[in-house]
């Protein structure tokens, strides 16, 4: 009696520990249960006739992983699909455009010096770029319809003047597209005024951001490795005190042009650090910081599909999953009690412990729960019930042979042991195959089912036995009719 109570107390301690884990550790919910965004990214080969190699895809995934981590979206996942696509899931993220801006850019950073005798051309292009930026400000500042009409007329005239200044032919494009065309033309011509350079983003060790002293805009700070610091010092030394500018080019676009003071003529800018200032907002500075920290993409990446799941749909999926799980458990409970009486009640306790242990493991590992994962959990409940059915049927067989209840229980467990082990091992082999060969949701299903297989073995062979022994230690419950109806009992026991 004391021994059975000791094992029962240990089991209750495990149950309490599992319960505390469940209430104190957060659960990770997947996209379909929590809501969020899913982006499909396609990796493009530099040569259209070339196939993308697996190591190239892995390199792209590694860079994107660092960028996603920099975004600070919790529980995000990035996986490959096929030979040239990746699926990014951002649970809880309802504005995928922010992630798209960061992930879709190559982030190839270059530091170049201006070509000789291009000062006047650079100033001309910078004036045009300033006018284009002013047009954007005018459009945003228009508030009432009357002023908007006046501004649109002025803007149309300015756009035509800029097209003439850049030598662009008349266009049938709308005003917005014409402004974009002018902006691209100006940028490409500015970039052409800089010499190629060997100093790139690959020479960086870190990037950060800080607010400028005027408190209205932000700047991005850079730290070079030793080789990069030497290159930067040499580059700035060569143009210090001249009218040649230092251009900072990101993905073929000049984001900043700066002059280098005469005081750096002797050694250049040393210290291995630099600052990019270009009227950044807090958000744009953060995006650039994330891109530079993640590194440049070895191959171009385009976003081919964006899917957003609202939080209400995720809540609805959780509600339906809970209803399905509770309904399944209720039907199992009715079946077990109807067929196995007291043993059925004990099995329900064991199944409740089984469910609690599962959820505690999900929180502890942690496992990201998705709808397929919930399906794997529900299926594993069926396996746990099946193990109890095997045990109780062996117990009933022993009772029909005329054995005592205690002896029948011990013999029933011994005889069912090998069958339970065999069934669980075969299922576990399937889970391992699905987990390593499958992708995405299939892995989630395999993970929860595999965890369920291990816990099912524990609850069937340990928890159920401890509970049966504990309840059978009370004489009032030690009745054969608690397992079999009177017409099922052998004659010597009726």
Swiss-Prot record:
The chain crosses the membrane at residues 7-27, 322-342, 345-365, 372-392, 420-440, 441-461. It is found in: Cell inner membrane. It is a multi-pass membrane protein. GO terms for biological process: intracellular protein transmembrane transport; protein targeting; protein transport by the Sec complex. Belongs to the SecD/SecF family. SecD subfamily. Part of the Sec protein translocase complex. Interacts with the SecYEG preprotein conducting channel. SecDF uses the proton motive force (PMF) to complete protein translocation after the ATP-dependent function of SecA. Probably participates in protein translocation into and across both the cytoplasmic and thylakoid membranes in cyanobacterial cells. GO terms for molecular function: protein-transporting ATPase activity. Gene3D superfamilies: 3.30.1360.200, 3.30.70.3400, Multidrug efflux transporter AcrB transmembrane domain. This is Protein translocase subunit SecD. The keyword Zinc does not apply. HAMAP family: SecD_B (MF_01463_B). Pfam families: Sec_GG (PF07549), SecD_1st (PF21760), SecD_SecF_C (PF02355), SecDF_P1_head (PF22599). GO terms for cellular component: plasma membrane. Forms a complex with SecF. Part of the essential Sec protein translocation apparatus which comprises SecA, SecYEG and auxiliary proteins SecDF. Other proteins may also be involved. It comes from Prochlorococcus marinus (strain SARG / CCMP1375 / SS120). Its main location: membrane. Keywords: Cell inner membrane, Cell membrane, Membrane, Protein transport, Translocation, Transmembrane, Transmembrane helix, Transport.
């Amino acid at each position: 009696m004391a021994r059975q109570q000791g094992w029962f107390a240990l089991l209750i301690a495990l149950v309490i520990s599992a319960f505390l884990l469940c209430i104190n550790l957060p659960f990770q919910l997947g996209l379909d249960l929590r809501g969020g965004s899913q982006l499909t990214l396609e990796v493009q080969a530099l040569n259209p006739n070339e196939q993308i190699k697996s190591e190239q895809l892995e390199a792209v995934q590694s860079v994107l992983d660092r960028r996603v981590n920099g975004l600070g979206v919790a529980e995000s996942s990035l996986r490959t699909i096929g030979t040239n696509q990746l699926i990014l899931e951002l649970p809880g993220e309802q504005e995928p455009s922010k992630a798209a801006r960061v992930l879709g850019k190559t982030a190839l950073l270059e530091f170049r010096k201006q070509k000789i005798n291009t000062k006047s051309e650079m100033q001309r292009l910078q004036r045009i770029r300033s006018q284009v930026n002013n047009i954007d400000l005018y459009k945003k500042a228009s508030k009432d319809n009357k002023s908007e009409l006046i501004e649109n007329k002025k803007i149309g005239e300015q756009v035509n003047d800029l097209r003439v200044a850049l030598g662009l032919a008349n266009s049938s494009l709308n005003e917005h597209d014409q402004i974009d065309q002018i902006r691209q033309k100006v940028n490409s011509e500015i970039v052409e005024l800089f010499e190629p350079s060997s100093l790139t983003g690959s020479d960086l060790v870190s990037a950060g951001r800080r607010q400028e002293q005027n408190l209205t805009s932000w700047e991005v700070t850079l730290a070079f490795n030793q080789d990069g610091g030497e290159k930067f010092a040499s580059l700035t030394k060569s143009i210090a005190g001249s009218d040649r500018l230092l251009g900072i080019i990101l993905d073929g676009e000049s984001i900043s042009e700066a002059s280098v003071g005469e005081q750096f003529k002797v050694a250049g800018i040393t210290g291995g650090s630099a600052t990019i200032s270009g009227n950044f907002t807090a958000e744009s500075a953060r995006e650039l910081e994330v891109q530079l920290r993640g590194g440049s993409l070895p191959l171009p990446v385009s976003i081919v599909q964006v899917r957003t799941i609202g939080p209400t749909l995720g809540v609805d999926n959780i509600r339906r999953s809970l209803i399905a799980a509770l309904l399944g458990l209720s039907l199992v409970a009715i079946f077990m009690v109807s067929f196995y009486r007291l043993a059925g009640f004990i099995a329900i306790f064991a199944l409740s412990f089984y469910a609690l242990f599962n959820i505690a493991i999900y929180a502890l590992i942690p496992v990201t729960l998705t709808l397929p994962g919930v399906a794997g959990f529900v299926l594993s409940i069926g396996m746990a019930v099946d193990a109890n059915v095997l045990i109780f049927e062996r117990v009933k067989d022993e009772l029909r042979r005329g054995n005592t209840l205690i002896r029948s229980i011990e013999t029933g467990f011994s005889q069912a042991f090998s069958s339970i082990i065999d069934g669980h091992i075969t299922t576990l082999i399937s889970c391992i195959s699905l987990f390593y060969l499958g992708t995405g949701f299939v892995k989630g299903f395999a993970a929860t089912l595999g965890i369920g297989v291990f816990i099912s073995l524990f609850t069937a062979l340990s928890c159920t036995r401890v509970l049966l022994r504990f309840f059978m230690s009370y004489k009032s419950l030690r009745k054969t009719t608690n397992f079999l109806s009177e017409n099922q009992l052998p004659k010597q026991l009726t």
